[in-house]
């Protein structure tokens, strides 16, 4: 259910883009993200920090897109979110000395410290590369290609990287945890 809620604004954005234009899609994205946030609060009495940050960025960059009637702002949102994710992962590892991935999954998984560090760094690099790819596609290719990349390309890349991370984790789990 939660994964569906996370992807709902993206689906709404894509549908409105295909039916109308980038500005209607941006408006729909803001509304859908707000509805999902409100629903999460009412249903689960909890809103995740990243969902709240994403909502704020959607409102800010979406609002700028609509106010200035300039789609470059909504295109930057993707890269800014990925930069924040990468930054949080790197700060957790290099400043706080405990990888964010370990903080998020450490209660469920037992892994050696170097594995947590490599996994954390891999996700940071992944987010940086996705942000850079977004910049290139958003500003050098036609808008419809960027929308398809944002909706399908980044989603597929994230799913593939999640699967690869799962394989990496499984390979490094203690033998008794694998069964």
Swiss-Prot record:
Coiled-coil residues: none
Major localization listed first in the record, in broad terms: membrane
Q: How does it sit in the membrane?
A: Multi-pass membrane protein
* A Pfam family matched in the record: IspA
Q: Which residues cross the membrane?
A: 22-42, 50-70, 76-96, 121-141, 149-169
Its keywords, alphabetically, are:
Cell inner membrane, Cell membrane, Membrane, Transmembrane, Transmembrane helix
For this UniProt entry, what's an example GO CC term? plasma membrane
The reply on keyword Transmembrane is yes
Task: Name the NCBIfam families on file.
Answer: ispZ, PRK00259.1-2, PRK00259.1-3, PRK00259.1-4
Function in brief:
Plays a role in cell envelope biogenesis, maintenance of cell envelope integrity and membrane homeostasis.
Please state which protein family the record places this protein in: Belongs to the YciB family.
The protein's name is Inner membrane-spanning protein YciB
Q: Which organism is it from?
A: Shigella dysenteriae serotype 1 (strain Sd197)
